[in-house]
Amino acid sequence: MQPISPDGSLSPWEPGMFSLAVYAVLVAAFVAVQLFVAWWLGERKPGVEKARPYECGIIPTGSARLRYPVPFYLVAIFFLIFDMEGAYILTWAVAFEELGWAGWLQMSFFIGLLLVGLVYVWKKGGLDWRPSYGKK
């Protein structure tokens, strides 16, 4: 099946596909033009001053490359995990009446599994902020 027939008309489903293809080409062209303009107008020779970190107009004192403590990463990962779980629970709450008791049982199992995971992380010390040398 050809997108455009010999008489110049489109089949019923093909105008949407044709519009999608035209849109994709236009977006790709726009992105390419923006990247080219940024490259063309951009700084060619960055010096030491340009590479220095900017701290609100104040001359930096010390290195800007500091290491973050690992608990911050762990809290971020736990937040993402439990945030996604919250999204699942919210969608379940919206469709609660249609799902009935079967959906309630499935969500209860899901929440129970989440609680088991939270207790596991807690017991392994993932929520403890003390330094590792001070743990008992």
Swiss-Prot record:
Ranges annotated as spanning the membrane: 20-40, 70-90, 99-119
Disulfide bonds: none
Keyword S-adenosyl-L-methionine recorded: no
Entry GO terms, CC: NADH dehydrogenase complex; plasma membrane
Alphabetical list of InterPro entries matching this protein: NAD(P)H_OxRDtase_bac/plastid, NADH_UbQ/plastoQ_OxRdtase_su3, NDAH_ubi_oxred_su3_sf
Protein keywords: Cell inner membrane, Cell membrane, Membrane, NAD, Quinone, Translocase, Transmembrane, Transmembrane helix, Transport, Ubiquinone
E.C. code: 7.1.1.-
Function: NDH-1 shuttles electrons from NADH, via FMN and iron-sulfur (Fe-S) centers, to quinones in the respiratory chain. The immediate electron acceptor for the enzyme in this species is believed to be ubiquinone. Couples the redox reaction to proton translocation (for every two electrons transferred, four hydrogen ions are translocated across the cytoplasmic membrane), and thus conserves the redox energy in a proton gradient.
Record's subunit section: NDH-1 is composed of 14 different subunits. Subunits NuoA, H, J, K, L, M, N constitute the membrane sector of the complex.
Family that this chain belongs to: Belongs to the complex I subunit 3 family.
Protein name as it appears in the record: NADH-quinone oxidoreductase subunit A
Organism field: Syntrophobacter fumaroxidans (strain DSM 10017 / MPOB)
Organism ancestry: Bacteria, Pseudomonadati, Thermodesulfobacteriota, Syntrophobacteria, Syntrophobacterales
